[in-house]
C-alpha cells in the first residue's frame, strides 16, 4: 500500500503518491522520493518518460505551440532523449505530462527547470499540445498544481518564468495564478532574425492563493 499525502491547496485537491522505484524518473535528489502522480478534479499529472517522446515531439513542432517558445527550432526525438538523460534524470528538470481526466487523454506538459535548491527557486514552463483543449482552463489548473507542488513538497521559495510579449493568453493565466510581472527585457532574444521583448514574471511561496 502506497503512502498518500492529501492537501487542499489553492482550492484544488492535490494528491501526491510516492513510491521508491526508479521506474519513475522525477527523483527528488534531496529526499529520494519519486513522484508518480498529482491529481485534481479535471486533470492529473504523471511523470514524463521515454514513452512520451512521440507526443512531446509532435506537440513541440506544432506552430501554435512553437510560436510561443523562446526556443523555436525544430524539436527532434534526439533532442528530447538527450534532455531526458542530461536534465530530467539528473533532477535539474522535473517534468510532467498533463492528462485530461474524463477522456483519459494526454494534452500537454508542465515542468520546473534549472531547479536551484540552495537558492530555493526554479523556472516554470507549460504548454498544451492538443488544440481542442486550449482555452478550457486546463493550463491554469496545471500551473496551480505545480505551484503548490513546488512550494509544499520541494520547499522552493520562488517560481519564475519568461514569456514573449505576444503570448497574451499565457500572460493572463499567470496573473490569475498569482504571478506578478517583475520586468520587461526589450529585444532580449532574436527569433528568425527578429528581436523580441521578453516578460519576466515570478511568484513567491508567501503569495496569497489566487
What does each model-found stretch correspond to?
Residues 1-35:
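N-terminal amphipathic/basic-hydrophobic helices that include classical n-h-c signal peptides
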Residues 25, 30-82, 207-210:
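A short, well-structured alpha-helix characteristic of acyl/acetyltransferase catalytic modules
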Residues 135-149, 171-176:
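Conserved acetyl-CoA-binding loop-helix of GNAT-fold acetyltransferases
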Residues 160-163, 180-197:
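Conserved catalytic-core motifs of GNAT/GCN5-like acyltransferases
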Residues 174, 179, 201:
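Conserved active-site tyrosine of GNAT-family acetyltransferases
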Amino acid at each position: 500500500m502506497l503512502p498518500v499525502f492529501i492537501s487542499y491547496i489553492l482550492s484544488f485537491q492535490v494528491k501526491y503518491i510516492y513510491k521508491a522505484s526508479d521506474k519513475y524518473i522525477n527523483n527528488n535528489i534531496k529526499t529520494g522520493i519519486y513522484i508518480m502522480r498529482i491529481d485534481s478534479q479535471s486533470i492529473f499529472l504523471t511523470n514524463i518518460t521515454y514513452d512520451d517522446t512521440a507526443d512531446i515531439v509532435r506537440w513541440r513542432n506544432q506552430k501554435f505551440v512553437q510560436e510561443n517558445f523562446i526556443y523555436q527550432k525544430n524539436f527532434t526525438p534526439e533532442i528530447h532523449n538527450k534532455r531526458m538523460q542530461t536534465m530530467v534524470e539528473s533532477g535539474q528538470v522535473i517534468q510532467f505530462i498533463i492528462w485530461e481526466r474524463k477522456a483519459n487523454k494526454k494534452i500537454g506538459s508542465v515542468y520546473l527547470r534549472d531547479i536551484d535548491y540552495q537558492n530555493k527557486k526554479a523556472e516554470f514552463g507549460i504548454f498544451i499540445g492538443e488544440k481542442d483543449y486550449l482555452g478550457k482552463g486546463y493550463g491554469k489548473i496545471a500551473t496551480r498544481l505545480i505551484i503548490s507542488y513546488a512550494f509544499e513538497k520541494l520547499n522552493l521559495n520562488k517560481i519564475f518564468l519568461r514569456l514573449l510579449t505576444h503570448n497574451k493568453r499565457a500572460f493572463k493565466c499567470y496573473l490569475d495564478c498569482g504571478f506578478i510581472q517583475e520586468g520587461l527585457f526589450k529585444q532580449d532574444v532574436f527569433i528568425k532574425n527578429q528581436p523580441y521583448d521578453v516578460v519576466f514574471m515570478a511568484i513567491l511561496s508567501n503569495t496569497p492563493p489566487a
